[in-house]
């Protein structure tokens, strides 16, 4: 998606979603033995990022891929704010509490498989 049109159209039909999913699953990355097709994202993670809209005036969120301590692929979310001079969405971070008294990212996702819906049409 081009940043000039960001965010653009955010809803797609199930048929389009199925086609995109099929393309991914047929790609070299999607065919890999340890391929992750989706992520289960707890509402708590999404709500934490959405709260950044008020506190940090974010325009968007960015998801980074990583591997956690359990060896699972995961997504880590950060807020992003558009730099009007450059047009680039820059990551912004909120300070954590207690043990996380530093810039924080939001996690909690689980890879699919194994945490997927076996009956999904996507």
Specify the residue positions occupied by each region the protein language model found.
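Detector for the mature cores of small, proteolytically processed
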Residues: 1-122
